Amino acid sequence: MNSFSAERAVSPLDGSELWVVLDPELVPHREASDFLRALHGASRSPHTIRAYAGRVASFLGWCASQGVEWSSVSLASLARFKHFVEATPGRDGRLRSGATVNATLTAVCEFLRFCARTGVIEQAVAGQLSEPRWLRFTPPGFDAGESGQFRRMRARLLKARAETAFPEAFTPDQAGQIMACCQRPRERFMVTLLHDGGLRIGEALGLRRSDLHLLPDSRCVGCTVLGAHVHVRHRANPNGALAKSPFPRTVPASDAVLFSYADYQHERAEILGEDGCDMVFVNLYHEPLGAPMTYRAAKRLFERLARECGFPVRPHMFRHTAATGWVRAGTDLDVVQALLGHVSLASTTVYLHARDADKRRAVEAVAAGRRYR
């Protein structure tokens, strides 16, 4: 296959991370790179942009290897590309899941639609990616409009079969085991913050000290939010961490978060003294000391916890655990939505799934009251 590649670049203006797609001659592919810059300008997550860069590069490479002109690609050719993605093993040697195939096609479709909007390709190329479809049944939280006009959606023709995966959450015993494996105060604070607050790892790594309002009353610093809380804000950070949602939110801080943060602050002061870094999470155990903690460092932490605990430990599982706990405690879905920072309530309803134990109790409760002859 003619190799197109996704490469990381650094903006000479503000030092922010950018992604470009290079052709086999190592020349930036103009349309693909413009698309990625547009995603950056729209404040899309760095992880999303990086993933889209690789998927668009794969599509362009496939087109070049098959003699297909990407700018006038047909629906039949896109179906062939879909089959190629399905049949080609990933880096781990396994075939890609339906969800991964769909994610690849989503990136390609967004790229083609962007090119159509900017006049690079014909509108007909983007128009073939979907078809009119009337939604008879709508998901929870979906606004169909006053006259039902939003029920008429456009369904992608290129879609792989994907199984619905329920969010992975820790049991109370597993959460306790993870905490017991945390060796240092900074580790305990991070795990507690993710577990109790439901923050994404990018949101946690992007926190500034000024975002933590841990007094019962923060009006002295101009904040009217009651009680101890954490502000989650979307902005550029020196460690590349970024909150996914562009909308700011506040998350109440539990007593466990307060106590673990105090322990972490003592540890930080003992190691660094009076450091001037405003980032909450900084390097304490390796050089450069005092520098903002990176995604790579956080990844090493959770990989170590997984090895010691004997089960998968990923940062996002703490978010799933927090959300599942709130829902099962009877918290209204709109409150859970606000805590998680979901734009759509439909994203929150995934936590309404029934456990096997719940289903068994329901069946046995009804069956116990019946009399069979």
Residue ranges, per PLM feature:
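C-terminal secondary-structure termini that scaffold catalytic or DNA-interacting sites
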Residues: 2-5, 367-373
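N-terminal core-binding DNA-recognition domain of tyrosine recombinases/integrases
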Residues: 32-47, 57-142, 177
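Short pre-functional
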Residues: 109, 188-202, 210, 324-325, ...
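Basic, Lys/Arg- and aromatic-enriched nucleic-acid-binding interface segment
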Residues: 163-164, 168-201, 205, 275
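Short, basic (Lys/Arg/His-rich) helix/loop patches that form interaction surfaces
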Residues: 289, 299-338
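Catalytic-site neighborhood detector that most strongly recognizes the C-terminal catalytic loop/helix
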Residues: 340, 344-365
